[in-house]
């Protein structure tokens, strides 16, 4: 079975839900991973996704962050295998959702992340970003061992060149 996977930083699902639903209808994407939902799970209209043939699993947070993985029917989540945030890393922010998807007779591990933006090296946010990335690096080998079919995707918030950002002067 062939699948298509797309990742999209929506910068507010509340604002972009119509465009996301249009995208799903037009592309018949197998798996869509969203970042920067900026809303809690309870506020997401999961029925709207179901209506167009998709199942949604989200890990949200009011106003900031949040990730969601959306599957086209007949793909299904294995809910007992879901992980929210990096195990062993205390984090009040909703930044990572690891789900397992049944694809025919195979399992696919989808790790959807909204990686921290460390801003500049001098920023007080930079040590948090480095600690988060280190925790991810420490956790990933166990995931690869358990799930040989694994995809890590999302908004990595890494911009090595000016052309990688919207406004390099800011």
Walk through the language-model features, giving the residues of each.
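Structured beta-strand-rich core segments of catalytic domains in phosphoester-bond hydrolases
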Residues: 37-38, 44-120
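N-terminal, active-site-proximal structural segment of metallo-dependent hydrolase catalytic domains
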Residues: 1-54, 64-67, 160
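Soluble or luminal CAZymes and related metallo-dependent hydrolases
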Residues: 12-16, 91-93, 128-136
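Short amphipathic alpha-helices and their capping/turn segments at secondary-structure boundaries
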Residues: 22-24, 95-105, 135-148
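Active-site-proximal beta-strand elements of phosphoester/diester hydrolases
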Residues: 2-12, 107-122, 153
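Active-site neighborhood of phospho(di)ester-bond hydrolases with catalytic His/Asp-centered motifs
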Residues: 32-35, 58, 152-154
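Short glycine-enriched, charge-decorated loop/helix-capping segments at active-site entrances
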Residues: 123-127, 167-170
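Metal-dependent phosphoesterases centered on the DNase I-like endonuclease/exonuclease/phosphatase
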Residues: 52, 132-170
């Amino acid at each position: 079975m062939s699948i298509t996977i797309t990742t999209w930083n929506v910068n507010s699902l509340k604002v972009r839900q119509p465009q996301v639903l249009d995208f799903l209808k037009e592309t018949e994407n197998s798996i869509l991973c969203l970042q920067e939902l900026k809303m809690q799970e309870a506020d997401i209209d999961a029925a709207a996704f179901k209506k167009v043939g998709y199942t949604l699993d989200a890990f949200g947070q009011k106003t900031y962050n949040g990730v969601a993985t959306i599957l086209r029917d007949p793909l299904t989540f294995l809910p007992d295998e879901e992980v929210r945030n990096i195990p062993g890393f205390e984090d009040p922010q909703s930044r990572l959702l690891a789900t397992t998807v049944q694809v025919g007779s195979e399992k696919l591990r989808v790790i959807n992340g909204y990686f921290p933006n460390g801003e500049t090296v001098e920023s007080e946010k930079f040590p948090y970003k480095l600690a988060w990335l280190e925790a991810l690096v420490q956790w990933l080998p166990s995931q690869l061992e358990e799930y040989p079919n694994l995809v890590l995707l999302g908004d990595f918030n890494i911009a090595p060149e000016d052309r990688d950002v919207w406004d390099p002067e800011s």
